[in-house]
Every structure is written in structure tokens, then in C-alpha cells.
Amino acid sequence: MPHNRRNYNKTHSIALSGLLFALAMALSFIEGTLVIPGLLPGMKLGLANIVVMYALFFMGPKQALVLDVLKAFFVFLVSGWTAGFLSLCGGLLSLLVMWLLYYHCPLRPTWFILSVCGALAHNIGQLLGASVILSTAVSLYYAPIMLVLGLVMGM
């Protein structure tokens, strides 16, 4: 019986990972088609990142990392190299910050705090990625706006 239970858990995990990836792709695609007045060019709500956060909490860091990398690859296929790279940079830093806070902080922060910190880290990761692409720190002038909007989007 334990062998069958292990196979069930593995099958369940693979199926759930596939469903979460499909949901992340759908949300990413929908988010790319939305036109929200007042948002700066390239600014999105981060709906697909909610799926990665869910995976981190309920499936663990390994599955969340795989989902985050697959999501960035999807963005690369749909929107190009630059968008995929920025998605990867933001996603990895966001995941790292949420992982550190959730698994290594003695006082468990609330989901709200984790979401806000993850959104801020995502924007910082994207700004750092843009600095690498542009080979200059000029993109950091965008930081105050990105951080304020990241704070709002994380809520």
C-alpha cells in the first residue's frame, strides 16, 4: 500500500503542477491583453505570480521554482527575450525573498506581508535585470515608481 500511496502523491503533484502552470500561462496571457488606465508601459498586475506564490506555500520551493522558470519561458515565447529575461529576474528574486521569509523567519509573516514583499522583490529583480540589459543603472531611476506600484500591486 505505501508504494501505491507514493505513486498517487507523485501523480497528484505532477497533475497539480500542470494545472498551476496552465493557470499561470492563462493569467499571464490575459494580463498582457488588459489595458489598465494609469499603469505605466510594461507595468502589469502580477496575476500569474499569485500562482507561483500558491505553489511555494502548498507544494514547496522546488515546485515553485520550476513553475517560475516555466512561466518565464512562456513569457519569452510569447513576448520575446527581454520580457522573458525580466520575468525570470523578477520571479527568481521574488521567490527567494518569499522563501526566506516563509521558511526561515522565526515569526511567520502573513500572506499579505509575503505578497507585498514578493511584489517589491519582483520589481527590484526586474530593475536589476533591465540594468544588465542596458549595461547601465539608468533604469534605477524608474525604481521609486516601480516600488510604489509594487507595493500597491502586492496588496
Language-model segments: residues:
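Generic transmembrane alpha-helix motif of multi-pass integral membrane proteins
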Residues: L45-P61, V97-Y102
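Hydrophobic transmembrane alpha-helices of multi-pass small-molecule transporters
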Residues: I50-M53, A72, F76, L95, ...
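Interfacial aromatic-anchored transmembrane helix boundaries in multi-pass membrane proteins
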Residues: S28-L45, V69-M98, W111, I133-V138, ...
